[in-house]
């Protein structure tokens, strides 16, 4: 989510923007402000990262659970509890945060929502059950959301999924796909890669130019696959809703 917003904010000329997971926030950056994204507001790495920021630096928390530990260490908090969800895997919270922040910088969120709604009735293609490897590609915002899509497939399906910038894919990773692979391009840029992908025997889905709407389409596809495979999408193995280290309980 943060990668997508940072990319779009810079492309819109709103200023240099960084994106880091809580565990990788560097020291010494001269930021004017920070936005901390957390559905639960309890993950140790995020809370610790905010605590370590310079005193007086404005920090806005976008949090799905009010009254959380993160809410106690940020300067101000935007309550997104309406977008919270019981599932371990984030879908609604993610698309809500993306819509909010991308919309601030000019993204046509209403158009994306309309396109996304049209995807909700799509059925799985007949060949979906044959796919063993999922690859997501995009540029700019699409590249960031390709990583988000790949993460969702790993979490929901415990399957091999990857995300790459479209132009980088030909530099090596394309060699690992074949007839049991699906390559999903989230935007409409770089059509020249399509034939190279098809030549490997892989299936190809090409987005319609709106990576935010396409992310919802990908969620719908994943929902169909978990039904097909008999998986509980709300409780995937080995992961929890929040990662709280023992010393912070």
Q: Can you say where each PLM-predicted feature lies in the sequence?
A:
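Internal, active-site/partner-interface "lid" segment
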Residues: 65-66, 72, 102-132, 231-249
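Anionic-ligand anchoring segments at beta-strand to alpha-helix junctions in alpha/beta enzyme folds, i.e.
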Residues: 1-32, 132-178, 223
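Catalytic-loop motifs flanking and including active-site residues across diverse enzymes
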Residues: 1, 5, 96-100, 145, ...
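Short amphipathic alpha-helix initiation/capping segments at coil-to-helix junctions
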Residues: 176, 186, 190, 210-214
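Phosphate-moiety recognition in structured ligand-binding domains
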Residues: 196-249
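Glycine-rich phosphate-binding loops that contact phosphosugars or nucleotide phosphates
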Residues: 1-120, 139, 182-207
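Short capping/connector residues at structural and topological boundaries
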Residues: 169, 174, 179-182, 236-238, ...
């Amino acid at each position: 989510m943060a990668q997508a917003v940072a990319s779009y904010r810079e492309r819109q000329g709103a200023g240099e923007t960084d994106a880091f997971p809580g565990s990788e926030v560097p020291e010494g950056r001269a930021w004017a402000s920070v936005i901390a994204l957390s559905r639960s507001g309890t993950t140790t790495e995020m809370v610790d990262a905010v605590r370590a920021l310079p005193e007086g630096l404005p920090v806005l928390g976008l949090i799905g659970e009010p009254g959380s530990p993160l809410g106690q260490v940020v300067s101000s908090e935007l309550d997104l509890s309406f977008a919270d969800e019981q599932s371990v895997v984030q879908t609604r919270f993610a698309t809500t945060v993306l819509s909010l922040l991308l919309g601030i910088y000019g993204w046509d969120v209403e158009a994306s929502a309309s396109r996304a709604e049209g995807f909700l009735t799509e059925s799985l293609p007949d060949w979906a059950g044959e796919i063993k490897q999922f690859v997501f590609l995009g540029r700019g915002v699409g590249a960031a959301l390709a990583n988000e899509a790949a993460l969702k497939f790993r979490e929901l399906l415990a399957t091999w999924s990857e995300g790459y910038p479209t132009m980088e894919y030909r530099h090596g990773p394309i060699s690992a796909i074949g007839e049991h692979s699906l390559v999903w391009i989230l935007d409409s840029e770089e059509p020249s890669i399509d034939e190279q992908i098809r030549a490997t025997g892989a299936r190809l889905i090409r987005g319609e130019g709106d990576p935010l709407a396409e992310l919802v389409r990908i969620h719908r596809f994943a929902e169909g696959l978990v039904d097909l495979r008999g998986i509980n999408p709300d409780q995937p193995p080995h992961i929890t809703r929040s990662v709280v280290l023992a010393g912070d309980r």
